[in-house]
Curated annotation (Swiss-Prot):
<dbReference type="GO" id="GO:0005634">
    <property type="term" value="C:nucleus"/>
</dbReference>
<feature type="region of interest" description="Disordered">
    <location>
        <begin position="80"/>
        <end position="165"/>
    </location>
</feature>
<dbReference type="GO" id="GO:0000981">
    <property type="term" value="F:DNA-binding transcription factor activity, RNA polymerase II-specific"/>
</dbReference>
<keyword id="KW-0479">Metal-binding</keyword>
<feature type="compositionally biased region" description="Pro residues">
    <location>
        <begin position="121"/>
        <end position="135"/>
    </location>
</feature>
<dbReference type="GO" id="GO:0060257">
    <property type="term" value="P:negative regulation of flocculation"/>
</dbReference>
<feature type="region of interest" description="Disordered">
    <location>
        <begin position="1"/>
        <end position="41"/>
    </location>
</feature>
<protein>
    <recommendedName>
        <fullName>Uncharacterized transcriptional regulatory protein C15D4.02</fullName>
    </recommendedName>
</protein>
<feature type="compositionally biased region" description="Low complexity">
    <location>
        <begin position="19"/>
        <end position="29"/>
    </location>
</feature>
<dbReference type="GO" id="GO:0036349">
    <property type="term" value="P:galactose-specific flocculation"/>
</dbReference>
<feature type="DNA-binding region" description="Zn(2)-C6 fungal-type">
    <location>
        <begin position="174"/>
        <end position="201"/>
    </location>
</feature>
<dbReference type="InterPro" id="IPR036864">
    <property type="entry name" value="Zn2-C6_fun-type_DNA-bd_sf"/>
</dbReference>
<keyword id="KW-0804">Transcription</keyword>
<feature type="compositionally biased region" description="Low complexity">
    <location>
        <begin position="83"/>
        <end position="94"/>
    </location>
</feature>
<keyword id="KW-0862">Zinc</keyword>
<feature type="compositionally biased region" description="Polar residues">
    <location>
        <begin position="136"/>
        <end position="160"/>
    </location>
</feature>
<dbReference type="GO" id="GO:0000978">
    <property type="term" value="F:RNA polymerase II cis-regulatory region sequence-specific DNA binding"/>
</dbReference>
């Protein structure tokens, strides 16, 4: 909506009632997504709550902005309200929403937060949005101008509007698809084109919001959420110390663990960074159940046991059916919290293990749901491992079914070793102590670099809980390493781990041949070095004798 002083109106104080007749109101439709109108700073951080119909915690479920004639108003820096003249009553229901800093505390977002589902948000007509234009002051009493835009400093002309619409098509897709000049399906946070072509999705510069709001067409960074108080009606508190701890410590740690496992350019890697650092905090600000579960998890990481117990009890009431990735996120956060509190909820933990393993793939509505489920499984297994390293898990907790989750096969020796990290704590869980003397004895007989011992131990532990078929394939792959020495130790560790469990005769023969070959080369190298040293000593002695 734009208002401009009429050339025929007297120049008087705009606060006077008589000035109402001195303005011409025009309506321009549709409003451009990046309007140049000034907006209140709080509008840029106001996020509507997720509707119950949204099944994905990512932004993929939000509908794209369409150039249809919908204009949903949010109070920005609207012009001052001019009271209606008593002589010219109006039936217009348009009212200006007060600022959130209004001392009257009358600020309310009920007109924004009623229902964000796109199918239930009506499109108000221009009559509902714009107050009727009073008749021009003059002798001809002509009809008010309602369809023509009056030019002003902040108004967009028609050509500018056309440019904005034409440019919008290239700014809503991901950066990778825009560089490739192909149509992007705009799934968030990674489009399906990048997943299918195995390219790194560089993300979006435009994240559409539900059609019930009209905000700046840009993705709200988490840093801006931390600098402003939480808008009225949202669940999370961006300035809460526990929330800040998650943003500054927990989320980077989760991203780092995933980055160590996934290839740098894989979609999983970029998805993980966006999901833990941005999507989950934004969900916590909108959804009170996710917020409480996140606070419980972060409090446990901060070693605030009492807070973790209190938050976990509060969130436990909200658990019903696990049918979406949102509810799965809540369940995993609460289950991980049980690993760090004194009196663990064994029933909740084992229920979470069962749900994570058996989560119905038919409920997934997009590729992002599948990736989110995979990330949550990974995170759950990893937290069990890390907790088991610190202390034995509480009696009754049974995380072993997590090992049956489908994991992608390792393709490099480094991936094999990294894969074993997820199962490091399971040795204590299963009390597999019989392997340690064998491994220690073998290590003493075949000394290696001490820096390799932890990685070899990880692989040996992992081999206990790995199927023999994949273990044999991994050993075959490791033996192809150009440097045979670490490969031999890794293969021997695997064979010790599965000794008496499965017959790997052929594989053992290959390992023994590799060991023998390596020992022969080491012996030859030792003899060669000794011969060189003897020759140098003799030549030095001859030189001294000649002097």
């Amino acid at each position: 909506m734009e208002y401009h002083p009429s050339s025929q109106s007297p120049q008087v104080n705009p606060g006077m009632e008589s000035q109402q007749g001195g303005y011409t109101y025009t309506y321009q439709q549709p409003a451009p997504p990046n309007s140049l109108h000034l907006q209140h700073p709080s509008i840029l951080t106001r996020l509507p709550p997720l509707s119950s119909s949204v099944v994905s915690p990512s932004l993929a479920s939000l509908p794209p902005f369409t150039p249809t004639s919908t204009y949903h108003s949010i109070a920005a820096l609207t012009p001052p309200s001019y009271p209606q003249s008593s002589s010219a009553p109006s039936n217009n229901s348009y009212t200006i929403v007060p600022s959130p800093h209004d001392p009257s505390n009358a600020y309310s977002m009920h007109h924004v937060l009623q229902n964000t589902a796109p199918q239930s948000v009506p499109s108000p007509s221009p009559i509902e949005m714009v107050p009727p234009s009073p008749p021009k002051t003059g002798s001809n009493n002509s009809a008010p101008v309602t369809g023509k835009t009056v030019q002003s400093g902040n108004a967009l002309n028609n050509s500018g509007l056309v440019k904005r619409q034409a440019r919008k098509r290239t700014k809503t897709g991901c950066l990778t698809c825009r560089k490739r000049r192909i149509k992007c399906d705009e799934r968030k946070p990674i489009c399906y084109n990048c997943i299918k072509s195995k390219r790194q999705c560089e993300g979006y510069t435009h994240f559409p919001r539900p059609s019930g709001t009209f905000t700046a067409s840009r993705r709200i960074p988490v840093s801006s959420l931390l600098s402003e108080p939480a808008p009225h009606g949202l669940a999370g508190q961006p300035t809460h110390p526990t929330f800040l701890y998650y943003i500054q410590s927990v989320a980077p740690s989760l991203c780092l663990w995933d980055a160590c496992h996934f290839p740098p350019l894989s979609p999983y890697s970029s998805f993980s960074s966006i999901y833990w650092s941005s999507t989950v905090p934004e969900l916590a600000l909108r959804n009170p159940n996710i917020s409480v579960a996140l606070y419980a998890f972060a409090s446990a990481k901060r070693h605030l046991t009492d807070d973790a117990v209190a938050f976990a009890r509060q969130a436990r009431v909200a658990l019903t059916n696990i049918t979406t990735t949102d509810s799965l996120l809540i369940l995993v956060l609460l289950a991980v919290t049980q690993l760090y509190i004194p009196k663990s909820d064994i029933q909740l933990f084992n229920f979470a293990v069962d749900q994570v393993v058996k989560f119905d793939a038919s409920l997934m509505t997009s590729p992002s749901d599948e990736i989110i489920t995979y990330l949550l499984r990974r995170m759950f297994i990893r937290q069990v491992v890390l907790a088991g390293i610190v202390k034995p898990l509480a009696s009754g907790l049974n995380p072993l079914p997590l090992l049956k989750c489908d994991l992608p096969p390792a393709t490099t020796p480094t991936a094999v070793l990294d894969e074993s990290l997820f199962h490091l704590g399971l040795r204590k869980l299963c009390h597999e102590k019989g392997l340690e003397p064998e491994f220690t004895k073998w290590s003493k007989n075949c000394p290696i670099d001490k820096a390799d011992l932890p990685r070899l131990a990880l692989l040996m532990i992992h081999a206990v809980f790995t199927s023999p078929v994949s273990l044999a394939q991994w050993v075959e792959l490791i033996l192809q390493n150009p440097d045979p020495t670490p490969a031999i130790h890794i293969a021997r560790a695997c064979l010790l781990a599965v000794h008496g469990v499965v017959d790997l005769g052929d594989l053992q023969m290959k390992v023994e041949k590799c060991v023998q070959s390596c020992e022969e080369r080491q012996l030859q190298a030792t003899i060669s070095n000794f011969s060189t040293e003897v020759a140098q000593t003799n030549s030095s002695a001859l030189a001294i004798g000649c002097q």
